[in-house]
């Protein structure tokens, strides 16, 4: 009841019909003058502007390194601020507080090497009534060069940014509307997914509900695996095994030929790549026949590279390090771009600027490099073997999702992470379900997009047009505030005409007549 009355008071405060819109806009525009309110948080407001209506082409931070402009979709107060984290480091952040603010905050993560403010989801979160918060994670752009010989900027990226932007953002909300958010949420994918679990492990009081998409957990092995995968296709030696887009189209068609119908229907989607025992040997050219043009078969070197790609990675002493690349990833354009004879940029930068030094010769890259990455593991960026007990005890909830066709982070990694948490906590799946659920999204690539029904409100670019579909932001709020957990995630196709229920792990998606249903392994 207390929260309901507080939210009602906030809505009255911000409702133009009650004559308070002018007060809100005045308070917003003068917020930068309230320096003393944020001194203890080392926070300086650099600009605060009230937007009475939607606006296009709004200047963004770091326009030459990230996006030049952004869009504001609802009336709101845009506050830009800097948090000093040391004598040589700082986080640049923004919080957008809409006039229809609901008393909830939404902190946002980032992607890749994470130096760009997520404006798309600032707009999305604020449009749904959240005070939306995002930062540049302590550096601008996607390069890892700022990490070189600077442990403070590295610490901002790994551990401090989400925590600090959230604390500062909540303080700004309190200064503007009179009280801190009644509920706090987080949403991020990829690096943002890793940040989600890092927050749950290390700062369990920050958030009531967390959405973690395709998390880049097991970070060192993930980036390390990409370096090794690239080496199979000539990135560190020669280009004899590079496969062009036409060749990857051949590979994709063979994958579908061998594995599409494993889920009971031929629809161009491999529902679960781990269930596909893909045999690239079927594509090898007969003795003495080259690949030719158009590509009709692959060379022995190319098939060998594929066999390595689709097998797990093991350490120097035979220990398991990381899953294979995702067999269910079939987009030939994406695959030809990824495995083009060049080292994956995040891997290259991490090795050069954090692990080995800028003069490292990648011809020396190998499993031993991955083991060095694991040994270094600054600030435990691996984010794999943590403890969710404090987050669970405080009543926190987690929705994790992962595209089954993800070409960047294998969905097998999310299963391994989930099972590691079950082991750490000593819980069975039905017990984990009480606070933590993992959903595997058939056909979806990295975070959004792909084939089939992959839109469920996980991102500002993936808002479903069919009202029968799920919205994962609504789902996490409903779980935290009403105790109603999602049994499935219902995704919608881009045109909204097709829906599909995506299952929570360890259930599996199985065709039952004309519809997919979720079933446990013993029932399949």
Where are these regions (language model features)?
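Catalytic-loop region of hydrolases
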Residues: 14-102, 119-120, 265-266, 270, ...
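Cap/lid segment of the alpha/beta-hydrolase catalytic domain
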Residues: 112-178, 224-225, 359-369, 378, ...
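Fungal secretory targeting signals
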Residues: 1-21
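A catalytic-pocket lid/entrance helix-loop region that shapes and gates access to the active site
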Residues: 198-200, 205-316, 454-470, 474
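Gly/Ala-rich beta-loop-alpha elbow adjacent to hydrolase catalytic centers
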Residues: 188-192, 196
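Short beta-strand/loop motif that positions the catalytic acidic residue
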Residues: 400-402
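N-terminal cap/lid subdomain of alpha/beta-hydrolase-fold enzymes
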Residues: 78-163, 190, 201, 230-235, ...
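Conserved alpha/beta-hydrolase "acid-adjacent" motif
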Residues: 408-412
């Amino acid at each position: 009841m207390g929260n309901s009355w507080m939210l009602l008071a906030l809505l009255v405060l911000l409702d133009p019909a009650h004559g308070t819109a002018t007060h809100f806009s005045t308070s917003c525009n003068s917020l930068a003058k309230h320096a003393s309110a944020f001194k203890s948080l080392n926070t300086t407001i650099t600009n605060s502007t009230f937007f009475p209506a939607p606006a296009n082409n709004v200047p963004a931070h770091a326009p030459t390194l990230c996006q030049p402009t952004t869009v504001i979709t609802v009336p709101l107060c845009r506050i830009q601020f800097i948090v000093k984290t040391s004598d040589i480091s700082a986080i640049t952040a923004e919080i957008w507080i809409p006039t229809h603010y609901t008393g909830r905050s939404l902190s946002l993560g980032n992607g890749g090497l994470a130096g760009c403010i997520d404006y798309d989801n600032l707009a999305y979160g604020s449009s749904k009534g959240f005070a939306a918060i995002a930062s540049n994670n302590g550096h601008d752009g996607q390069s890892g060069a700022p990490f070189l010989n600077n442990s403070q900027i590295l610490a901002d990226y790994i551990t401090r940014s989400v925590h600090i932007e959230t604390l500062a953002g909540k303080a700004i909300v309190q200064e503007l509307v009179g009280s801190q958010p009644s509920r706090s949420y987080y949403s991020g994918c990829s690096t943002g997914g890793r940040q989600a679990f890092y927050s749950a492990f290390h700062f369990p009081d920050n958030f009531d509900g967390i959405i973690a998409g395709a998390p880049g957990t097991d970070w060192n092995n993930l980036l390390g695996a990409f370096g090794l995968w690239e080496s199979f296709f000539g990135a560190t030696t020669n280009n004899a095994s590079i496969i062009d887009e036409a060749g990857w189209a051949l590979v994709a068609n063979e994958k579908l030929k061998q594995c599409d119908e494993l889920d009971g229907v031929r629809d161009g989607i491999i529902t679960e790549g781990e269930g596909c025992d893909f045999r690239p040997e079927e594509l090898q050219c007969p003795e003495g026949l080259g690949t030719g043009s158009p590509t009709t078969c692959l060379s022995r070197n190319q098939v060998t590279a594929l066999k390595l790609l689709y097998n797990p990675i093991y350490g120097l002493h035979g220990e398991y390090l990381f899953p294979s690349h995702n067999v269910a990833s079939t987009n030939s354009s994406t695959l030809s771009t990824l495995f083009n004879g060049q080292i994956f940029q995040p891997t290259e930068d991490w090795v050069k600027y954090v692990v080995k030094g800028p003069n490292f010769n990648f011809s020396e890259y190998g499993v031993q490099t991955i083991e060095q990455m694991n040994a270094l593991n600054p600030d435990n960026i691996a984010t794999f073997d943590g403890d969710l007990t404090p987050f669970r005890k405080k009543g926190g909830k987690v929705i994790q999702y992962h595209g089954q066709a993800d070409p960047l982070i294998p969905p097998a990694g999310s299963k391994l992470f989930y099972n590691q948490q079950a082991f750490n906590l000593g819980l069975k799946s039905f017990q984990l379900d009480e606070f933590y659920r993992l959903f595997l999204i058939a056909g979806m690539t990295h975070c959004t997009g792909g084939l089939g029904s992959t839109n469920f409100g996980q991102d500002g670019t993936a808002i479903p047009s069919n009202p029968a579909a799920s919205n994962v932001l609504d789902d996490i709020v409903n779980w935290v505030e009403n105790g109603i957990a999602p049994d499935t995630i219902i995704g919608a196709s881009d045109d909204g005409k097709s829906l599909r229920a995506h299952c929570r792990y360890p259930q599996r998606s199985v065709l039952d007549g004309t519809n997919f249903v979720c079933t446990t392994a013993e029932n399949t």
